Every structure is written in structure tokens, then in C-alpha cells.
Amino acid sequence: MQKKIILIAEIGENHLGKINYAKKMIRYVKHSRADYVKFQSYNEKCLTKDDPEYEWFKKVSLSDKDHYDLQNYSKKQKIKFMSSPFSLERAEFLCESLKMKEIKVASAKMTDLRLLRYLNKKCNKGIKSQFLKNYKSMLEFVNIN
């Protein structure tokens, strides 16, 4: 059986917090023949105010409404919508409210065992990053699956 390579176009936070930019990027991605367009899901609750990048992440975080809009827009453009949650709360939103069954785990969250266990139960397909921090974290990750 031949495996198909899955192409994920990472928009991440490059939309600069502007939904019209995000939609424009989705249109461009559609023409690249990518299978998925991927964003990042976090909110102010995921951040601490003493984080040097707090203002940046606050600016580029997507609201729940933004997620719904971008998911629907992606569907209209015939490209699959995906996002990487940066907290259990955001994972619950993606899985339960948006009904997402495919989640890409951010490399920064590969050692968040609570998040990984939740996603393992709720997702049909978890797409994992290959950038593991060390051998121990790799073993913990593999043992969850």
C-alpha cells in the first residue's frame, strides 16, 4: 500500500491577528495543493503577563468566533482546517466545539502529558511534531499512544 504525503501549510500566527489576512492566506494555500491549513490556538489565559512576548501573543491569538469563521472559510475553499492547541482548554474547544478530529501537537507541548492524554482520547488522528526535547520525553510521548 502506497502512503500519501500529507502537506500542512503552517499559517500559525502570520495573520498578525487580522482575520482578513488569514482568509487571504487560506486562498493562497488552496492553490499550493496543501491538504491542511494550520493555525495556533491559545489565548490570554495560556500566557503570563510577565512573558516578554505577552503583548504579541495577545495580539495574534484567535477568538472562538475567529476559529469558527476560519474553519468555515477553509471548508468553502476545500482545504482542511487544523490548529495546534497550547492548553487543555484550547484542545477542549477544538475537539468539542469545533468537532475537530485531527490535531497537530505543537513541539512545545510534546511533554504536556495531560494535554496529550486528552487528545489521544478525543482525536481520530493526532499529528505529532518530530522535534522532541530529549529521549525521555520521546519515550513518554510514545507510551501515551
Which stretches of residues belong to each language-model region?
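Catalytic domains of carbohydrate-active enzymes, especially glycoside hydrolases
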Residues: 23-42, 97-99
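Short beta-strand segments at enzyme active-site cores
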Residues: 8-9, 34-46, 80-85
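Conserved, mostly hydrophobic/aromatic
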Residues: 10, 29, 94
